[in-house]
Amino acid sequence: MGAMATVLQADGFRVGILLPPRVHPPRHVHVARSCRTRGAEVVLLLPQGPAGVVVRTVFGMRDADVIAAVWLVEANGALLMRAWRTYHGGTATE
């Protein structure tokens, strides 16, 4: 995996966005539990229009942590969208 920028740390989670040139649509974030199983991660698609956050892939993360990660990303959606645009440009619809 390429370099990743940490754009949010809260509630024991680290939220990151892959840095260019490693970009692949759709817009998404990688969320890891800071103090739990090493390597556990969930990839969440950022909201598009009326659709909310969508779980794309889960790697070894407990269901309760996945739910908490979704809530965290939903609560910080505007911040994460700005971060995506900062690193990848455009309207963040990619």
Model region roles, listed by residue range:
Residues 15-20, 45, 77, 81-86:
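Broad hydrophobic/π-residue packing in well-ordered secondary structure
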Residues 56-94:
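Well-ordered alpha/beta subsegment
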Residues 15, 20, 28, 91-94:
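Residue-level detector of solvent-exposed, low-hydrophobicity positions
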Residues 1-16:
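Negatively charged, low-complexity tracts enriched in Asp/Glu with abundant Ser/Thr
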Residues 7, 29-31, 73:
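Hydrophobic aliphatic residue packing
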Residues 20-63:
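A short, structured beta-strand/loop element
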